[in-house]
Amino acid sequence: VDNTFATPANCRPFEWGADIVTHSTTKYMDGHASALGGAIVDSGKFDWTAYPDKFPGLCTPDDSYHGVTYTQRFGLGGAFITKCTAQLMRDFGCVQSPQSAFLLNLGLESLPFRMKQHCANAQAVAEYLQGHEKVKWVKFAGLKGDKYYDLAHKYMPNGTCGVISFGLYGGRKAAETFMKHLKLGAIETHVADSHTCCLHPASTTHRQMNAEELLAAG
């Protein structure tokens, strides 16, 4: 389960049966767009040995690490996360710098307080957009009538998150005009930090795609 937007402050996936949770710590956990990072959290409850053909990397000897079989050596509680740290981090080099880890730790200290305000701000903005004559649709699980409203309140009783998606009448041209007239929001390709960020993928990160390709990409 990718819990980046909800964060542990709002959603506890392990309590609902998730086995592994991932986070882009660059987002709300850091909170200030100051450090790149990611996290994998293993519940230690999944039985990898029940599916040896699907998970040979955990259930058969690792020749690159003295022939260790992770499930045998570290048990179900440690097999996956040990492989991640011992082998995958070694091969991919995804080790956070001490300075980035320090900045992330600072961000984590205020996470619950920031998320509470992010959710309140997003709720107010979503409700305003929902009632605006130039807004065609709004997707935000905190709005009554949203198809995920009940699920959001079940799994995220403290709030959803601060990310909203909405569309304007007039299509791409109207969206680009809206972006050019922002006064408080910053035009970025980053989301989920202490700043008010506004993204329009069709004219930025996905601008090389034609109409059909944009539709296929969601």
Give the label of every model feature segment.
Residues 1-132, 139:
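Conserved PLP-enzyme active-site core in the AAT-like
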Residues 115, 134-218:
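Conserved C-terminal alpha-helix-loop-beta "cap" of PLP-dependent enzymes
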